[in-house]
Structures are given as C-alpha cells and as structure tokens.
C-alpha cells in the first residue's frame, strides 16, 4: 500500500491522537456486542466542551458510560500528570501520547457568552437559534426546548465533521434531490 490514510483536521493540528478522547472503553469495547458502533462509545463532545448553557461536568455521558460516568479529572497519563485539569476557569487537557503537550479546551458556554473573550456570534447563533423562524431569536434567553439545534436533539458532529461541508441538505435546497418536493437529504 503506497498511501496510508490519515485523519486530518483541527484536532490533529493540535497534536491530538484518538486516545486523547477515546479511552480503553471506546477502543476495546466492554466485552458486549453492540447493535451499532456508536453504542460502544463512552464519551461525548459535551463531556469536555460543555454546552451553550453549562460548563462541562468532565465526566463521560455517552451511550456506553456507566450511570455515574468516568470522571475525566481522575484520569492520569503515563507520566503521572492529570489528563484533564481545571486551572482557574480554564479546562486543560494533556496529551496521552506526547509528554509536555497540552491545550486549552474551548468551552461552548464561553463561546456563547457575550462578555467572554472567546465569544463567537456565529457559533452562538448556531447553538442557540430558536426554531421560530418568524422571530429568528438566538442567545441564552432562548429556552433549550425551543432551540433548533439543541444538544438534546442533535449530536455535535451532525455539523462538526469533515464530511459535513455545508448547510446544504438540512437548510438549503440541493440538486441531488431535485425531483422530490422537499429538496433535502432524508
């Protein structure tokens, strides 16, 4: 094989490896057969990044997590340092494979908070947009049950993935289904 495919993107650019997020459970399973791959995953994005309304609990909450989850701040790397550590208001993650490499976690609550230096208006709108298209409201004042993209309805990688390159199909008409009435991917 001349070419070995590799994962590319933001996380790889930071120096992250798969094991930085996916621990033993996600890599080796729990000994039980699952009906789909996702059912064997212990961690979810909000476990480290939180939501637009709350900072992360820093414990696993995925389909394969136990009822109380695994506390991420209790995990130690081979060098003895904590894998995840709160330093003031900042959540730091240290690489499991590269000693000395660490990064600041981006927290959705800060991205959605206007007085924060991390505030991003486009991200805030995407995460908190109301389903009511007549008002086009967004922000923390929109209740979770009224949000178009609430974390109770959509997983983060619905939009945040290398294969989701545009809003076409969900929000914009596409030529692929031009014969259908809705013009959307179903």
Model-assigned labels for residue ranges:
Residues 1-16, 20, 24-158, 162-186:
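Primarily the internal scaffold of c-type cytochrome electron-transfer domains
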